[in-house]
Amino acid sequence: MSARPFSTGPLVGRAIPHESAHLHVSGKAAYVDDLPELAGTLHAAAGLSTVAHGRIKNLDLAAVRAYPGVRCVLTAADIPGENNCGPILHDDPIIASDAIQFYGQVIFAVAADTRDAARQAVRLAKVEYDAETPILSMDAAIAAESWVLPPFAMQRGPVDPAFANAPHRLSGTAHVGGQEHFYLEGQVSYVQPKEDHTLHLICSTQHPTEMQQLVSHALGWRSHQISVETRRMGGGFGGKESQSAQWACLAALLAVRTGKPVKIRLDRDDDMIATGKRHGFQYQWQSAFDDAGRLLGLKLEMASNCGYSADLSGPVNDRTICHIDNAYYLDAVALKSLRCKTNTVSNTAFRGFGGPQGMFVIETVLDDIARHLGRDPLEIRQINFYDVEPGARSTTPYGMLVEDNVAPALVAELAAECDYAARRAAIAEFNAGSPIIKRGLALTPVKFGISFNATHYNQAGALVHVYTDGTVLVSHGG
C-alpha cells in the first residue's frame, strides 16, 4: 500500500511509478526470505530422484533421520490427504510413492534446524531403483503414442482441393525450444501453524487461491483453515502459477507434523531441476499459395513437450492453436496438435502461454514463401492480413470474427515512418559485399488474445473504500 499525492491534472499519457519502485531500488522491499523468522522455525529440503524413469525398489532413510538437526522426514505414505498438486488433472504427486517419472522428482522431504542441515541430510538417502528406458524427446513420444492429453485435430475449409489447385506448394519443419523462467526469487514458502488448527502460508506464488485449495486437500483440511499471503514476488512469469503448489504443500505437511513453522526455499540448481519450463514445440507443415504469396491452404502438425504430467498443457496448447493465424487469414487449414508425454519435468505456464509458439510457426511459413517467391517478407505478410472490414476474410480458423482490425493501417504507418524500404535496400547492398557479417531488418505484427478461453475466468472483483479524509483504498483480485 502506498500514499500518492492528489492531482487534478490529466493522467492519460503520464508516467505513473510502480508503487513499490522506491523500495525495490533501495533494497528495502521485503520478500519471503527477508521476513523475520519465528522462534523454532525449521527449514525444509527435498530429496530428488536420480533416474528419469523407473520404480523405487528400496528407500533407506535411516542416515537421513540420524543426521544432526533433522526433526522430521516425510514420505508419500505420511501424507494424510491427497498426494496431488496438479492444477487440473490429478496426475502430479507431491511426493513420488513408487513410480519415478522424471529426473529430479521429489521422493521425500526433510525438516531440520537449519537449511544447511536439511540440504546435507537429503544427500544421505540410499535409494535403489528399478530403472526403465525413459522417453526424452517429442519424436520418441510420438513413436510410442505417449500423450498427457489426447491429440486434437481441427479443420476449416476444403484443404485438399486448395492444395490441388494451388500454383505453389512448400513443406518444412521447425523447432522452438523450451525456456527457464529464471525468476530472481526462487520457489519459497513459509508456513506458520496458528491457533485453532489453522495455518498461515507466506508464499511466492501467482495463484494464492490454488495454494489454499491444494494445501487443504493434501492435509485433509477445509479451505477456511488455510490462509495464504503473497506480498510480492521476485519474478514469476508463469513459473509460480501452478509450480509453487508442490513446495507450499511440502512446507505445510512438515509444519503440521512437527507443530513448528517451516520454510522451504529451493536453491537455484534444485529449482531448475524440479520445476517446469516453457513448452518446447516442433512443427511439420505444408503450405499452398498463389503467385502473389497469398496463402491458399495450410496443413500443420505441431507437437509440444508437456513433460510427465498434464499441468497446464491443455490450455497452453489450446492457446497455441488459437494463435497459429496471428494476424493472417487462413482460408483452408488442417491442424493436428500432439501433447507429448515425456519423462522430463512437467512443463507449465510461461509468458504468452502458448501464443508465441503458435505465432512462430505461421511467421516461419510466410518467411519461406517470401524466400521462394523472391519477395520482401513484409509484403507477403501484408497480402495475408485479415480484411479491415468484416467479411469473408475476417474469421479466424476457430470461428471468431476479427473486428477493429488496425493491423494493416498500423503496419503501413510504421513501415513508412521507419523508412523500412530504404533501410532494407541499404541492408541488401551491405550484405552483398559482406560474406561473413550480415545485417537484417524485420517488421512483424502480433495479434494476441487477452482473455481466457474459458469464459468464466474472464471476471474479477474489486472493493473500494473511500475514507472521510478523502483517501481511497482499493482491494482487488489478481
Residue ranges and their predicted role:
Residues 1-154, 169-172, 257:
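Flexible, low-hydrophobicity surface segments
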Residues 14, 20-23, 27, 154-189, ...:
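Glycine-rich loop/linker segments at domain edges
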Residues 46-74, 108-128, 189-258, 315-325, ...:
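Alpha-helical support elements that line or immediately flank enzyme active sites
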Residues 74-105, 147, 210, 228-249, ...:
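Short, surface-exposed loop/turn segments at secondary-structure boundaries that line and modulate
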Residues 76, 225-231, 259-269, 296-301, ...:
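Beta-strand segments within the central parallel beta-sheet cores of soluble alpha/beta enzyme folds
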Residues 80-82, 165-179, 264-271, 438-449:
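Short Pro/Gly-enriched beta-strand edge/turn motifs at strand-loop
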Residues 106, 112-114, 256-308:
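Phosphate/diphosphate-binding loops
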Residues 175-180, 382-465:
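Accessory "access/gating" subregions that flank catalytic or transport cores
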